[in-house]
Swiss-Prot record:
Name listed for the protein in its UniProt record: Probable microsomal glutathione S-transferase
Example of a GO biological process term: leukotriene metabolic process
GO MF annotation terms: glutathione peroxidase activity; glutathione transferase activity
Family the entry assigns: Belongs to the MAPEG family.
Catalysed reactions listed for this entry: RX + glutathione = an S-substituted glutathione + a halide anion + H(+)
A GO term from the CC aspect: membrane
Membrane topology, record value: Multi-pass membrane protein
Superkingdom of the organism of origin: Eukaryota
Keywords per UniProt: Membrane, Transferase, Transmembrane, Transmembrane helix
UniProt source species: Dictyostelium discoideum (Social amoeba)
Record keyword Transmembrane present: yes
Length: 149
């Protein structure tokens, strides 16, 4: 009998898990970049101030750290209550936006590009609030149907 992963791992688990895995991978790369920047700019832990380039990298790492605590559960809840494929699309949009922004911070390709910064801000916020709003709607609908409020 062939191994059927779809019956074991449904889409509402697999899709947000993929987003979470990639997001945590991005976060790990940023942590590595931050460690390298600490060595390069001679900023000893736990200090987070020093060279402006170091502060840029530390700032992006901090932004990602703060966002992961919200984006991962929102992606899972949206996938469960609304749509796994839409959670993949919205979570993927957030990830691509974050990767582009991270590249501009960490790789010095676009130091002060306001257009790229604005696109990142719009995409990341729209995708996050869509995930959060959809999750709240799904939970509300579930409660309404359960208790006929």
């Amino acid at each position: 009998m062939p191994f059927d992963t779809k019956s074991i791992f449904p889409d509402f688990i697999v899709f947000p898990s993929a987003i979470s895995t990639i997001a945590i991978g991005l976060w790990s790369v940023q942590a590595y970049k931050l460690g390298e920047a600490r060595k390069r700019y001679n900023v000893k832990a736990p200090h987070v101030q020093g060279d402006p380039e170091f502060e840029r990298i530390a700032h992006e790492y901090q932004n990602t750290s703060e966002a992961l605590g919200a984006i991962i559960p929102a992606t899972f809840m949206f996938s469960y209550y609304i749509s796994p494929k839409c959670s993949l699309l919205l979570g993927g949009t957030w990830l691509v936006s974050k990767m582009l922004n991270c590249c501009s911070y960490c790789c010095k390709k676009e130091k002060e590009n306001d257009c790229a910064k604005n696109v990142h801000t719009c995409l990341s916020h729209i995708s996050f609030f869509a995930l959060l709003g959809g999750s709240a709607f799904g939970i509300g609908s579930s409660l309404y149907n359960r208790y006929k409020l």
